[in-house]
Amino acid sequence: MMQSTFAIIKPDAVSRQLTGEILAAMEASGLKIVALKRLHLSKAQAAGFYAVHRERPFFDSLTDYMSSGPVVCVVLRGEDAVPRWRALMGATNPAQAEPGTLRARYGQSLEANAVHGSDAQETAAFEIGYFFNGLEISE
């Protein structure tokens, strides 16, 4: 089934100039980049995006990190885009990620793990809408 999903290239990967390699891996996997923007989140924007984690002990650290430098937000489209992007990312903890996945290759820690991806279609819809309006997405 054709799906859209949302990805963020996180501050650690952007600062290490890995954006091009990660975008190339997205396309090489057969997913189509239909929207893209680079921005520097404020702490409040990061908190709004990660509001689902507000009560978790790592929330402040996560929002500090996600607002520490530029990120690249991407909308991906393709057959089964959500699970395909999650498989390409690998496990959240880079130490546990399968070899060859983006987090195994580029992740530095549980938090600085290079990339974010939506965990379900419903989450993807919220996350895409948080950063993009319909005019910014071109199939």
From Swiss-Prot:
Q: Which UniProt keywords apply?
A: ATP-binding, Cytoplasm, Kinase, Magnesium, Metal-binding, Nucleotide metabolism, Nucleotide-binding, Phosphoprotein, Transferase
* Function per UniProt: Major role in the synthesis of nucleoside triphosphates other than ATP. The ATP gamma phosphate is transferred to the NDP beta phosphate via a ping-pong mechanism, using a phosphorylated active-site intermediate.
Organism expressing this protein natively: Desulfovibrio desulfuricans (strain ATCC 27774 / DSM 6949 / MB)
Query: Could you tell me what reaction this enzyme catalyses?
Result: a 2'-deoxyribonucleoside 5'-diphosphate + ATP = a 2'-deoxyribonucleoside 5'-triphosphate + ADP; a ribonucleoside 5'-diphosphate + ATP = a ribonucleoside 5'-triphosphate + ADP
Q: Which family does it belong to?
A: Belongs to the NDK family.
UniProt-listed Pfam families: NDK
Q: Kindly identify the residues recorded as the active site.
A: H116
Q: How does it assemble?
A: Homotetramer.
Per UniProt, ATP binds at: K10, F58, R86, T92, R103, N113
Q: Which gene encodes it?
A: ndk
Task: Give the matching InterPro entries.
Answer: NDK-like_dom, NDK-like_dom_sf, Nucleoside_diP_kinase
Question: What are the GO MF terms of this UniProt record?
Answer: ATP binding; metal ion binding; nucleoside diphosphate kinase activity
Q: Protease: present as a keyword of the record?
A: no
Give the protein name, as stated in the record.
Nucleoside diphosphate kinase
What HAMAP family is this protein classified in? NDP_kinase (MF_00451)
| EC assignment | 2.7.4.6
By its UniProt entry, which NCBIfam families does this protein fall under? PRK00668.1
